[in-house]
Amino acid sequence: MAREKFERTKPHVNIGTIGHVDHGKTTLTAAITATLALDGGAQAKAYADIDGAPEERARGITINTAHVEYETKDRHYAHVDCPGHADYVKNMITGAAQMDGAILVVSAADGPMPQTREHILLSKQVGVPNIVVFLNKEDQVDDEELLELVELEVRELLSAYDFPGDDIPICPGSALQAIEAITANPTVKRGDNKWVDKIYALMDAVDEYIPTPERDVEKTFLMAIEDVFSITGRGTVATGRIERGVVKVGENVEIVGVTDTQTTTITGIEMFQKTLEEGFAGDNVGILLRGVTRENIERGMVLAKPGTITPHTSFESEVYVLTKDEGGRHTPFFTGYRPQFYVRTTDVTGSITQFTADDGSVVEMVMPGDRIKMTAEFIYPVAIEAGMRFAIREGGRTIGAGVVSKIVK
């Protein structure tokens, strides 16, 4: 039977499953689609459909990611699931699949494991704002006290990484039992089967606990400048794609980065040779700026609402270093290494001042394939902020991907 198109009338939220290998992330993804399909809110996807995720490229890195979509009574969701641990690391750092929230899957039979910890840390570093927990494989735990113990362990772990461990919803269940119940009885309704109900309960928690994100157009205006040219008798035009917010003719904007911040007024906005009164997030526009000479503005600067972004030279970041097979370096690099950082629209030279491991110890050397916390310093100030993505390049090829976790100065 042909399915009608999803109506985009509900608020949209991006989520994903995270957690240790074999704890049931992909099985849960399949169980959510199977359960919501009972009410027509999804197309049921089998484990194999999700697991055979196609490769995609983001910032020069190949990542395997499966995307499914579904809806609850309140919302429309886009859900990402990655087959391998390395794919998660790359996905979260490149922001290839931006997550407004995550479902952390923990096996009730095993409790938190090393990748559970690593995914929570990564979520914190890359700015995944909210987590809901699914304690999977509950059917394998006979002792109620054991289940409570695992829940306590998960809450403590979340709190250790500055998530509100005491408040986060933790939903027990079994993804496999839910799928089997639906396979055995495809007309099962909510209230008929305890395992199916537990998947509904999880989605209720996701609906209630993960807030609807602010849309890009509701944020403050920012556009990275891609090109600059002069129009005789009219002034200087900066072109680029509006990253966020809305901008109107007559408004003041700041030109930030590279040199001292300048303020100017927008005298015109053009898109596809047509003049506009305002430009929105996602639009590729040319913005005419009053009293700015061609020499005062260049690619790599940003236009922004005054007072909303400042230029910085030093920052901490979470970085994934490409392997040789991914087209990265063949050899390690050390503190003091000076690559190019590709930030928004331009390459900036910077030097790496420190590498730090997850446990806080200082590391001297980084190998291809590593994920590391890195402090770096640009040779001139650039408009950066926490959560911003960048690539690390050497001679024009990408050798790493990173996300700013903290501004130093």
UniProtKB/Swiss-Prot annotation:
Name used for this protein in its record: Elongation factor Tu, chloroplastic
Pfam families linked to this entry: GTP_EFTU, GTP_EFTU_D2, GTP_EFTU_D3
Alphabetized UniProt keyword annotations: Chloroplast, Elongation factor, GTP-binding, Hydrolase, Magnesium, Metal-binding, Nucleotide-binding, Plastid, Protein biosynthesis
The keyword GTP-binding belongs to this UniProt entry's keyword annotation: yes
Superkingdom as given in the UniProt entry: Eukaryota
Residue ranges of the region described as G4: 136-139
Enzyme Commission identifier(s): 3.6.5.3
Ranges for region G1: 19-26
Binding locations of Mg(2+): T26
